Amino acid sequence: IRNLKEEKIKPDDDPDKNEPVTMKLAKFLLSTADEPRPQDLHKMLEDILMELGVKPSAEKGLLGELQKLDVVGDSSCLPSGSNSSGKSTCNCLKEKGTRKCDCPRSYTDRTSNWGWDPYHEVFYFGDRFYQHLFAGNKHDLPLHVSLGPASEVDYTLCPKDFDRMLKTFREHNFHVNITGAGYDKGVDAMGDYFYFMEKNIPVAIPLNKRRAKNLKDGNLNLSSNAIPLCKAGKEMRRHYFKKEQMSHVYCCPIKRGSRKNGEFRYVTHREECPLDTLCEPDATLAPTVQVCTKDNPRFYPVIPRGSKRYKKLAKERTGTERSNSFKKWAYSFDKAQLKSRAHRLIRLHLLAVIEHRKAMFKEETRGLSKDKIVQLALKNMEIN
Protein backbone atom coordinates (compact mmCIF):
# COMPACT_ATOMS: atom_id res chain seq x y z
CA ILE A 1 0.00 0.00 0.00
CA ARG A 2 1.56 3.26 -1.14
CA ASN A 3 0.73 6.81 -2.09
CA LEU A 4 2.41 7.10 -5.48
CA LYS A 5 1.13 10.62 -6.09
CA GLU A 6 3.74 11.79 -3.60
CA GLU A 7 6.44 9.95 -5.59
CA LYS A 8 5.78 11.88 -8.82
CA ILE A 9 8.84 14.13 -8.80
CA LYS A 10 10.68 15.17 -11.94
CA PRO A 11 14.43 14.44 -11.46
CA ASP A 12 16.85 17.36 -11.42
CA ASP A 13 19.60 16.95 -14.02
CA ASP A 14 21.74 19.80 -12.68
CA PRO A 15 25.29 18.36 -12.32
CA ASP A 16 26.10 20.59 -9.33
CA LYS A 17 23.11 19.40 -7.30
CA ASN A 18 23.84 15.75 -8.11
CA GLU A 19 27.57 15.97 -7.39
CA PRO A 20 27.37 14.93 -3.69
CA VAL A 21 25.30 11.86 -4.62
CA THR A 22 27.52 10.75 -7.50
CA MET A 23 30.76 11.34 -5.59
CA LYS A 24 29.50 9.30 -2.64
CA LEU A 25 28.43 6.49 -4.99
CA ALA A 26 31.75 6.59 -6.88
CA LYS A 27 33.78 6.25 -3.68
CA PHE A 28 31.55 3.39 -2.51
CA LEU A 29 31.90 1.49 -5.80
CA LEU A 30 35.66 1.98 -5.82
CA SER A 31 35.99 0.77 -2.23
CA THR A 32 33.93 -2.38 -2.94
CA ALA A 33 35.37 -3.15 -6.38
CA ASP A 34 37.07 -6.35 -5.19
CA GLU A 35 33.98 -7.75 -3.49
CA PRO A 36 32.07 -10.55 -5.26
CA ARG A 37 28.61 -10.17 -6.72
CA PRO A 38 25.73 -11.03 -4.39
CA GLN A 39 24.03 -14.39 -4.89
CA ASP A 40 20.77 -13.17 -6.40
CA LEU A 41 18.61 -13.45 -9.51
CA HIS A 42 20.63 -10.77 -11.28
CA LYS A 43 23.83 -12.82 -10.88
CA MET A 44 22.17 -15.89 -12.38
CA LEU A 45 21.00 -13.88 -15.38
CA GLU A 46 24.41 -12.24 -15.80
CA ASP A 47 25.99 -15.70 -15.90
CA ILE A 48 23.50 -16.85 -18.55
CA LEU A 49 24.24 -13.83 -20.72
CA MET A 50 27.98 -14.39 -20.37
CA GLU A 51 27.89 -18.11 -21.21
CA LEU A 52 25.30 -17.99 -24.00
CA GLY A 53 26.01 -14.58 -25.46
CA VAL A 54 29.15 -12.64 -24.60
CA LYS A 55 31.72 -15.48 -24.54
CA PRO A 56 30.54 -17.18 -27.77
CA SER A 57 30.48 -13.81 -29.56
CA ALA A 58 34.00 -13.08 -28.35
CA GLU A 59 35.22 -16.49 -29.54
CA LYS A 60 33.83 -15.77 -33.01
CA GLY A 61 35.54 -12.37 -33.10
CA LEU A 62 32.32 -10.34 -33.02
CA LEU A 63 33.62 -8.18 -30.15
CA GLY A 64 36.79 -7.20 -31.99
CA GLU A 65 40.06 -6.92 -30.07
CA LEU A 66 39.30 -7.65 -26.43
CA GLN A 67 42.42 -5.76 -25.33
CA LYS A 68 41.18 -2.64 -27.12
CA LEU A 69 37.50 -2.80 -26.28
CA ASP A 70 35.31 0.30 -26.52
CA VAL A 71 31.92 0.20 -24.78
CA VAL A 72 28.90 2.47 -24.87
CA GLY A 73 25.99 2.76 -22.48
CA ASP A 74 22.52 4.22 -22.18
CA SER A 75 19.26 3.80 -20.29
CA SER A 76 15.67 3.39 -21.40
CA CYS A 77 12.26 3.62 -19.76
CA LEU A 78 10.36 0.40 -19.13
CA PRO A 79 6.68 0.87 -18.14
CA SER A 80 5.12 -1.74 -15.88
CA GLY A 81 2.33 -3.98 -17.13
CA SER A 82 0.33 -3.39 -13.95
CA ASN A 83 -2.28 -0.72 -13.38
CA SER A 84 -0.55 2.51 -12.37
CA SER A 85 -3.73 3.71 -10.64
CA GLY A 86 -3.72 0.84 -8.17
CA LYS A 87 -6.68 -0.41 -6.18
CA SER A 88 -8.54 1.66 -3.65
CA THR A 89 -8.19 0.67 0.02
CA CYS A 90 -10.45 3.36 1.47
CA ASN A 91 -14.21 4.04 1.63
CA CYS A 92 -14.08 7.47 -0.02
CA LEU A 93 -16.25 6.28 -2.93
CA LYS A 94 -19.02 4.97 -0.68
CA GLU A 95 -18.87 7.67 1.97
CA LYS A 96 -17.99 10.75 -0.13
CA GLY A 97 -18.69 9.65 -3.69
CA THR A 98 -15.05 10.45 -4.59
CA ARG A 99 -13.21 8.15 -6.97
CA LYS A 100 -9.91 10.04 -7.21
CA CYS A 101 -8.92 10.61 -3.60
CA ASP A 102 -5.46 11.13 -2.10
CA CYS A 103 -5.57 8.03 0.10
CA PRO A 104 -2.90 5.30 -0.18
CA ARG A 105 -3.72 2.56 -2.72
CA SER A 106 -2.76 -1.09 -3.26
CA TYR A 107 -0.51 -1.92 -6.24
CA THR A 108 0.12 -5.27 -7.93
CA ASP A 109 3.66 -4.25 -8.90
CA ARG A 110 5.26 -3.54 -5.54
CA THR A 111 8.71 -2.50 -6.82
CA SER A 112 7.77 -0.05 -9.58
CA ASN A 113 7.44 3.66 -9.02
CA TRP A 114 6.95 6.86 -10.97
CA GLY A 115 9.73 8.18 -13.16
CA TRP A 116 10.24 10.89 -15.76
CA ASP A 117 10.56 10.01 -19.45
CA PRO A 118 12.67 12.87 -20.88
CA TYR A 119 12.12 11.81 -24.50
CA HIS A 120 8.31 11.93 -24.38
CA GLU A 121 8.30 14.41 -21.46
CA VAL A 122 5.78 12.43 -19.43
CA PHE A 123 5.69 10.55 -16.14
CA TYR A 124 5.48 6.76 -16.35
CA PHE A 125 5.02 3.93 -13.86
CA GLY A 126 7.63 1.18 -14.03
CA ASP A 127 11.40 0.71 -14.14
CA ARG A 128 14.45 2.02 -15.99
CA PHE A 129 17.04 -0.33 -17.43
CA TYR A 130 20.66 0.43 -18.24
CA GLN A 131 22.96 -1.52 -20.50
CA HIS A 132 26.54 -1.47 -21.73
CA LEU A 133 27.28 -2.91 -25.14
CA PHE A 134 29.83 -3.22 -27.89
CA ALA A 135 28.76 -1.38 -31.04
CA GLY A 136 31.10 -2.41 -33.81
CA ASN A 137 31.58 -4.89 -36.66
CA LYS A 138 28.04 -3.97 -37.81
CA HIS A 139 26.50 -5.46 -34.66
CA ASP A 140 25.14 -4.08 -31.37
CA LEU A 141 25.99 -6.66 -28.72
CA PRO A 142 24.93 -6.23 -25.06
CA LEU A 143 27.68 -6.89 -22.53
CA HIS A 144 25.66 -6.22 -19.39
CA VAL A 145 22.11 -5.23 -18.43
CA SER A 146 20.71 -3.98 -15.13
CA LEU A 147 17.37 -2.71 -13.93
CA GLY A 148 16.40 -0.05 -11.41
CA PRO A 149 13.34 1.94 -10.36
CA ALA A 150 11.90 4.47 -12.79
CA SER A 151 12.85 7.29 -10.43
CA GLU A 152 16.57 6.48 -10.68
CA VAL A 153 18.60 8.44 -13.24
CA ASP A 154 21.66 7.76 -15.39
CA TYR A 155 23.97 9.54 -12.92
CA THR A 156 23.78 6.51 -10.64
CA LEU A 157 22.59 3.73 -12.97
CA CYS A 158 25.63 4.04 -15.25
CA PRO A 159 28.46 3.51 -12.71
CA LYS A 160 26.45 0.78 -10.95
CA ASP A 161 25.98 -1.13 -14.18
CA PHE A 162 29.62 -0.65 -15.17
CA ASP A 163 30.78 -1.91 -11.78
CA ARG A 164 28.62 -5.05 -12.04
CA MET A 165 29.89 -5.62 -15.58
CA LEU A 166 33.53 -5.54 -14.47
CA LYS A 167 32.81 -7.92 -11.59
CA THR A 168 31.00 -10.30 -13.94
CA PHE A 169 33.92 -10.26 -16.38
CA ARG A 170 36.38 -10.95 -13.56
CA GLU A 171 34.42 -13.85 -12.08
CA HIS A 172 34.11 -15.44 -15.53
CA ASN A 173 37.84 -14.99 -16.28
CA PHE A 174 36.84 -12.87 -19.26
CA HIS A 175 39.96 -10.77 -19.72
CA VAL A 176 39.33 -7.48 -21.50
CA ASN A 177 40.94 -4.06 -21.54
CA ILE A 178 38.36 -1.29 -21.88
CA THR A 179 40.04 1.58 -23.72
CA GLY A 180 37.08 3.96 -23.94
CA ALA A 181 33.43 4.46 -23.00
CA GLY A 182 30.77 6.64 -24.61
CA TYR A 183 27.69 8.05 -22.88
CA ASP A 184 25.11 10.81 -23.28
CA LYS A 185 24.71 13.96 -21.18
CA GLY A 186 22.80 11.99 -18.54
CA VAL A 187 26.17 10.89 -17.13
CA ASP A 188 27.60 14.43 -17.04
CA ALA A 189 28.30 14.49 -13.29
CA MET A 190 31.59 15.06 -11.48
CA GLY A 191 31.27 11.85 -9.47
CA ASP A 192 30.95 9.78 -12.65
CA TYR A 193 34.02 11.44 -14.20
CA PHE A 194 35.92 10.78 -10.97
CA TYR A 195 34.89 7.11 -10.98
CA PHE A 196 36.06 6.49 -14.55
CA MET A 197 39.25 8.50 -14.02
CA GLU A 198 40.13 6.29 -11.04
CA LYS A 199 39.41 3.25 -13.22
CA ASN A 200 41.76 4.72 -15.85
CA ILE A 201 39.05 4.56 -18.51
CA PRO A 202 38.73 7.53 -20.92
CA VAL A 203 35.13 8.62 -21.43
CA ALA A 204 33.29 10.63 -24.08
CA ILE A 205 30.43 12.54 -22.43
CA PRO A 206 28.79 15.73 -23.78
CA LEU A 207 28.23 18.60 -21.39
CA ASN A 208 24.73 19.11 -20.06
CA LYS A 209 23.21 22.01 -22.02
CA ARG A 210 21.77 23.50 -18.83
CA ARG A 211 25.25 24.53 -17.78
CA ALA A 212 27.09 24.72 -21.09
CA LYS A 213 26.94 28.52 -21.36
CA ASN A 214 29.33 31.08 -19.88
CA LEU A 215 31.59 28.41 -18.43
CA LYS A 216 34.56 29.54 -16.37
CA ASP A 217 37.44 27.79 -14.64
CA GLY A 218 38.94 30.41 -12.37
CA ASN A 219 40.01 33.26 -14.65
CA LEU A 220 39.84 31.07 -17.74
CA ASN A 221 36.81 31.46 -20.02
CA LEU A 222 35.55 28.28 -21.66
CA SER A 223 33.34 27.52 -24.66
CA SER A 224 30.15 25.43 -24.49
CA ASN A 225 32.40 22.38 -25.06
CA ALA A 226 34.67 23.42 -22.16
CA ILE A 227 37.50 24.40 -24.52
CA PRO A 228 39.62 27.40 -23.39
CA LEU A 229 38.89 30.66 -25.19
CA CYS A 230 41.55 33.13 -26.28
CA LYS A 231 41.30 36.90 -25.71
CA ALA A 232 39.34 37.21 -28.96
CA GLY A 233 36.75 34.69 -27.76
CA LYS A 234 37.76 31.91 -30.17
CA GLU A 235 38.22 28.30 -29.13
CA MET A 236 41.94 27.66 -28.73
CA ARG A 237 43.53 24.86 -30.75
CA ARG A 238 44.45 21.69 -28.87
CA HIS A 239 48.16 21.16 -29.44
CA TYR A 240 48.86 17.89 -27.60
CA PHE A 241 48.12 15.80 -24.52
CA LYS A 242 50.72 15.09 -21.81
CA LYS A 243 49.82 11.56 -20.80
CA GLU A 244 52.10 11.44 -17.75
CA GLN A 245 50.63 14.64 -16.30
CA MET A 246 47.14 14.06 -17.75
CA SER A 247 47.07 17.61 -19.08
CA HIS A 248 46.03 19.23 -22.35
CA VAL A 249 47.99 22.05 -23.97
CA TYR A 250 46.06 24.57 -26.06
CA CYS A 251 47.59 27.24 -28.27
CA CYS A 252 46.57 30.23 -30.41
CA PRO A 253 43.74 29.19 -32.77
CA ILE A 254 45.09 31.14 -35.78
CA LYS A 255 48.61 29.66 -35.63
CA ARG A 256 48.52 26.29 -37.34
CA GLY A 257 50.98 23.88 -38.87
CA SER A 258 51.37 23.78 -42.64
CA ARG A 259 53.57 21.96 -45.11
CA LYS A 260 55.03 23.70 -48.14
CA ASN A 261 57.64 22.31 -50.53
CA GLY A 262 58.13 19.37 -48.17
CA GLU A 263 58.93 21.65 -45.23
CA PHE A 264 56.76 21.85 -42.10
CA ARG A 265 56.22 25.23 -40.49
CA TYR A 266 53.65 27.16 -38.46
CA VAL A 267 51.61 29.74 -40.35
CA THR A 268 49.74 32.64 -38.75
CA HIS A 269 46.31 33.24 -40.31
CA ARG A 270 45.89 36.79 -39.11
CA GLU A 271 42.68 37.38 -41.10
CA GLU A 272 40.88 34.85 -38.87
CA CYS A 273 41.44 36.83 -35.67
CA PRO A 274 38.34 38.84 -34.65
CA LEU A 275 40.60 41.44 -33.01
CA ASP A 276 42.76 41.72 -36.15
CA THR A 277 45.87 41.64 -34.02
CA LEU A 278 48.43 39.25 -32.60
CA CYS A 279 48.70 38.75 -28.82
CA GLU A 280 52.27 37.45 -29.04
CA PRO A 281 53.63 38.09 -32.58
CA ASP A 282 57.15 36.81 -31.86
CA ALA A 283 55.97 33.40 -30.58
CA THR A 284 55.34 30.39 -32.80
CA LEU A 285 52.31 29.05 -30.91
CA ALA A 286 51.66 31.40 -27.99
CA PRO A 287 49.57 32.30 -26.20
CA THR A 288 49.26 28.80 -24.75
CA VAL A 289 47.17 27.35 -21.93
CA GLN A 290 47.73 24.10 -20.03
CA VAL A 291 44.80 22.46 -18.24
CA CYS A 292 44.88 19.29 -16.14
CA THR A 293 42.33 16.48 -16.27
CA LYS A 294 42.80 15.67 -12.58
CA ASP A 295 41.89 19.24 -11.60
CA ASN A 296 38.55 19.05 -13.41
CA PRO A 297 37.82 15.79 -15.27
CA ARG A 298 34.42 17.15 -16.31
CA PHE A 299 35.83 20.17 -18.16
CA TYR A 300 39.04 18.52 -19.36
CA PRO A 301 38.41 14.81 -20.05
CA VAL A 302 41.15 12.66 -21.54
CA ILE A 303 39.08 12.43 -24.74
CA PRO A 304 38.50 16.07 -25.80
CA ARG A 305 34.99 16.93 -26.95
CA GLY A 306 34.92 17.36 -30.70
CA SER A 307 37.98 15.17 -31.34
CA LYS A 308 37.91 12.23 -33.79
CA ARG A 309 37.98 9.78 -30.89
CA TYR A 310 35.06 11.56 -29.24
CA LYS A 311 33.01 11.56 -32.46
CA LYS A 312 33.72 7.86 -32.99
CA LEU A 313 32.39 6.93 -29.54
CA ALA A 314 29.41 9.27 -29.98
CA LYS A 315 28.57 7.52 -33.24
CA GLU A 316 28.90 4.09 -31.64
CA ARG A 317 26.58 5.18 -28.83
CA THR A 318 23.69 5.14 -31.30
CA GLY A 319 24.01 1.36 -31.06
CA THR A 320 22.42 1.51 -27.62
CA GLU A 321 19.34 3.15 -29.13
CA ARG A 322 19.06 0.39 -31.72
CA SER A 323 19.47 -2.28 -29.05
CA ASN A 324 16.92 -0.62 -26.78
CA SER A 325 14.48 -0.40 -29.69
CA PHE A 326 15.03 -4.09 -30.47
CA LYS A 327 14.18 -5.11 -26.92
CA LYS A 328 11.17 -2.83 -26.49
CA TRP A 329 9.54 -2.75 -29.92
CA ALA A 330 10.80 -5.60 -32.12
CA TYR A 331 9.80 -8.09 -29.43
CA SER A 332 6.84 -6.03 -28.13
CA PHE A 333 7.99 -5.71 -24.53
CA ASP A 334 4.94 -3.62 -23.66
CA LYS A 335 2.52 -6.32 -24.85
CA ALA A 336 4.02 -8.82 -22.42
CA GLN A 337 2.34 -6.89 -19.58
CA LEU A 338 5.00 -7.94 -17.05
CA LYS A 339 3.98 -6.93 -13.56
CA SER A 340 7.19 -7.44 -11.58
CA ARG A 341 10.77 -6.23 -11.84
CA ALA A 342 12.07 -9.81 -11.72
CA HIS A 343 10.06 -10.80 -14.81
CA ARG A 344 11.24 -7.72 -16.69
CA LEU A 345 14.86 -8.40 -15.75
CA ILE A 346 14.59 -12.00 -16.99
CA ARG A 347 13.08 -10.91 -20.30
CA LEU A 348 15.77 -8.25 -20.82
CA HIS A 349 18.57 -10.80 -20.42
CA LEU A 350 16.91 -13.37 -22.69
CA LEU A 351 16.49 -10.72 -25.38
CA ALA A 352 20.15 -9.77 -24.94
CA VAL A 353 21.10 -13.41 -25.60
CA ILE A 354 18.92 -13.36 -28.73
CA GLU A 355 20.82 -10.30 -29.98
CA HIS A 356 24.09 -12.22 -29.71
CA ARG A 357 22.64 -15.33 -31.35
CA LYS A 358 21.19 -13.34 -34.24
CA ALA A 359 24.57 -11.69 -34.85
CA MET A 360 26.36 -15.05 -34.79
CA PHE A 361 23.84 -16.61 -37.18
CA LYS A 362 24.14 -13.63 -39.51
CA GLU A 363 27.90 -14.06 -39.66
CA GLU A 364 27.59 -17.82 -40.21
CA THR A 365 25.18 -17.33 -43.13
CA ARG A 366 26.92 -14.41 -44.78
CA GLY A 367 27.11 -15.11 -48.52
CA LEU A 368 25.02 -18.32 -48.37
CA SER A 369 21.96 -19.02 -50.49
CA LYS A 370 18.47 -19.17 -48.98
CA ASP A 371 18.40 -22.98 -49.21
CA LYS A 372 21.69 -23.34 -47.36
CA ILE A 373 20.55 -20.85 -44.73
CA VAL A 374 17.39 -22.93 -44.13
CA GLN A 375 19.47 -26.11 -43.89
CA LEU A 376 21.82 -24.49 -41.40
CA ALA A 377 18.88 -23.21 -39.33
CA LEU A 378 17.32 -26.69 -39.23
CA LYS A 379 20.66 -28.17 -38.24
CA ASN A 380 21.03 -25.67 -35.39
CA MET A 381 17.51 -26.54 -34.26
CA GLU A 382 18.42 -30.25 -34.45
CA ILE A 383 15.52 -30.98 -36.79
CA ASN A 384 16.05 -33.87 -39.22
What label would you give each PLM region?
Residues 310-384:
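Basic, amphipathic alpha-helical segments enriched in Lys/Arg and hydrophobic/aromatic residues
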Residues 219-250, 297-339:
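Short amphipathic alpha-helical "interface-anchor" segments enriched in bulky aromatics
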Residues 153-261, 304:
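An internal, acidic/charged active-site-proximal segment
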Residues 6-198, 206-208:
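Polybasic low-complexity intrinsically disordered regions
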Residues 61-62, 307-308, 342:
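Short hydrophobic/aromatic segments of transmembrane alpha-helices and their interfaces
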Residues 1-5:
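Non-catalytic DNA-binding core/recognition domains of DNA-processing enzymes
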Residues 137-140, 144-146, 193-194, 201, ...:
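Extended accessory and catalytic-adjacent subdomains in large enzymes
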Residues 92, 99-103, 115, 251-306:
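Long, low-complexity, polar/charged, intrinsically disordered or flexibly structured peripheral segments
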